[in-house]
């Protein structure tokens, strides 16, 4: 019998770079590294409601053949997989785990209270931040565990850090390209600060896969881009730090309602790049002012432009955070961050 089975959005055969797919693959890869390639089975939840009969069979296979069964659904999938896991577990008595992707669970439970009773029966629920855990504890959960988001990246060494020292300073966004991630605020802010200062102080590169619901709008936006704004496309995970290391700052003015511990923050820290982020959801737990970047309260394009103008007056102070950002990334290595899950799979509970 295998040690672990993972049911998640692998998107097998498809080139998907969204947060759910990336985290599902990252966690599974680390399980294989720590437990052994042959000790981990997978079931792909990609396909939506039409694929549910197939998914039910695949999950049953995991319960039959694995000591620990893990689910990693998005919010719609949670309504299907939580009851399914508990139904199968009446017969197989496995250790069942739920790894939360993003920061939407507490809000979702407010309108789906029937799920609370079900999720309390899981052996552990792994959330991405202390704030998320506290919210679940307020609802009476005693099985919530913090497992920070993590990525397997080619982190820089300290002597590989780059310190941009002249205008124009390179800025970037590095997330799914959609309005709710603050893409338009970033564009407007860079336009504003360059216009107000009368020169090209900043350039902006927009990296990431364009959300399918935003493709038409973004296509129109690109037609209006000045020379100092360009679209860089999607970047492979193993190239993120190499791509980011020369950038002066990463902009993350998100207001995406499902935001958790965003992987883009780990990408930035691993490249030694400080972040300018909105005070949204859980960003303030991970973007530490004076250490890894700056947080903007009630962020909008005007406030972002003001912060950028202030930073341009003292770029040396901004660059002084690059080393501390790189060191902070060590907390989110797969080896360290995955320990709560690995310990429980190996029977070392510490709730």
Descriptions of predicted regions:
Residues 245-259, 273:
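Acidic donor-binding loop of glycosyltransferase active sites
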Residues 310, 317-331:
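A short, well-ordered alpha-helix in the C-terminal region of glycosyltransferases
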Residues 251, 270, 274-277, 287:
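Short hydrophobic beta-strand element within catalytic cores of glycosyltransferases
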Residues 5-7, 162-181, 186-192, 204-207:
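Conserved donor-binding/catalytic core segment of Leloir-type glycosyltransferases
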Residues 289-290, 294-301, 310-316:
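Conserved acidic donor-binding segment of nucleotide-sugar-dependent glycosyltransferases
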Residues 120-158:
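Donor nucleotide-sugar binding/catalytic pocket of nucleotide-sugar-dependent glycosyltransferases
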Residues 216-236:
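Nucleotide-activated donor-binding/catalytic signature segment of Leloir-type glycosyltransferases, i.e.
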Residues 44, 203-216:
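Glycosyltransferase donor-sugar binding loop
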């Amino acid at each position: 019998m295998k040690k672990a089975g993972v049911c998640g959005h692998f998107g097998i055969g498809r080139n998907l770079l969204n947060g759910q797919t990336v985290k599902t693959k990252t966690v599974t890869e680390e399980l294989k590294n720590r437990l052994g390639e042959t000790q981990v089975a997978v079931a792909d939840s990609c396909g939506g409601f039409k694929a549910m009969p197939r998914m039910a069979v695949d999950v049953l296979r995991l319960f039959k053949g694995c000591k620990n069964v893990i689910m990693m659904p998005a919010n719609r999938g949670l309504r299907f997989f939580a009851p399914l896991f508990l139904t199968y577990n009446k017969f197989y008595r496995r250790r069942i785990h739920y790894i939360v992707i993003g920061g939407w669970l507490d809000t979702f439970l407010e309108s789906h209270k029937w799920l609370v009773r079900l999720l309390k029966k899981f052996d552990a629920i792994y959330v991405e931040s202390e704030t998320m855990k506290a919210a679940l504890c307020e609802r009476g959960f005693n099985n919530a565990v913090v497992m920070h988001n993590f990525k397997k990246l080619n982190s820089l060494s300290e002597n590989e850090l780059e310190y941009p020292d002249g205008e124009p300073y390179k800025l970037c966004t590095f997330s799914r390209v959609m309005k709710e991630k603050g893409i338009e605020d970033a564009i407007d802010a860079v336009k504003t600060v360059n216009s107000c200062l009368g020169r090209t102080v900043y350039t902006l590169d927009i990296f990431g896969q364009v959300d399918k619901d935003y493709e038409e709008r973004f296509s129109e936006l690109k037609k209006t881009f000045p020379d100092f704004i360009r679209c860089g496309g999607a970047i492979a995970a193993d190239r993120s730090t190499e791509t980011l290391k020369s950038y002066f700052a990463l902009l993350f003015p998100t207001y995406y309602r499902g935001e958790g511990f965003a992987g883009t923050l780990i990408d930035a820290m691993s490249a030694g790049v400080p972040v300018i982020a909105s005070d949204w959801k859980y960003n303030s737990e991970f973007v530490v002012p004076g250490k890894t970047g700056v947080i903007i309260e009630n962020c909008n394009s005007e406030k972002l432009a003001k912060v950028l103008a202030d930073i341009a007056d003292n770029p040396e102070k901004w660059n002084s955070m690059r080393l501390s950002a790189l060191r902070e990334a060590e907390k989110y290595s797969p080896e360290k961050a995955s320990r709560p899950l690995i310990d429980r799979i190996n029977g070392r509970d510490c709730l």
